[in-house]
Amino acid sequence: MDGLFVILPLVIGWLLDLMLGDPAWLPHPVVGFGKLIAFGEHHLNKGHHRTLKGALMAIIYITGVFIIAWFLHNQLCIMHYALCIVFDTVVIFYCLAGTTLIREVRAVFLALDRSLEEGRKQVARIVGRDTSELSAQEVRTAALETLAENLSDGVIAPLFWLAIFGVPGMLAYKMVNTLDSMIGYKTERYKAFGCWAAHIDDVVNYIPARLTALLMVIAAGKTKLASFVWRNGRNHASPNSGYPEAALAGILNCRFGGPHYYFGQLFDKPYIGTNDRPLTTQDMRCAVRINRIAEVLMVVLTVLVMGIKEYIII
């Protein structure tokens, strides 16, 4: 396929996400993924061999999404390049979540300006932890941690797998990410059934999470923070999430992490950074700016990789 036809869907899809985010009135494939996962979990997460059943479900769902996307992409390309471009553009648009997350984080800070209770309710939309007892500082911290972590999950990682395996790889990654967000918890209900979903998510996010942190410190013009990120990025229950969070903590000179409640259970997480200063709206604006610059850098990098791949294949 001509290089322009490979790169055009990426640029258009990214610009659409930049302008529109995820409109509530549009059906989203991740919602379908979620229903499929909920169906499988309901029927399989019971009785014996839960770990095996959870692993098989995850593998079947991920490979199934990849194969279906690969088949559709190739069939549409055979029919007409224009159809292929439309399909790829729509998938890329749906798989990127940069704008929606930024809107949600801004909404958290605006809600906090009205009341603590509104802030708690708003942040509950984007975090998995229990929010009913969070202080205003903890609400702001949760929002900014999520902004950093989901720059990786919602933008950098999807683009990384797009660059490596094309649109099928990008969609398969979204299935991995959705599986982890729904069943990848260490609670009594999910610790056996969802452990392989969590392990797969750890593997596919290993490089993107560290790349995200690198892009963030470059975007901030603070490459000397690399040692801080490497040292503090390991202070997290996740092998990956700590790196983008450490990058933002270093950029803002603040502290993330600490103990949180999930589904009523206390998880004692280490701290990232040491400066426990109050977070402000200005910090949120700085974090959003860093996200956007890192996003642009990743789009450029993805275009270069896809262009080189196309040139080599030709």
Question: Where are the predicted features?
Answer:
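Hydrophobic alpha-helical transmembrane segments
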Residues: 1-171, 184-314
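Pseudouridine synthase
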Residues: 174
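Substrate/ligand-engaging "lid" and interaction regions
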Residues: 177
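Glycine-rich phosphate/dinucleotide-binding loop and adjoining beta-alpha-beta core of small-molecule
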Residues: 180-181
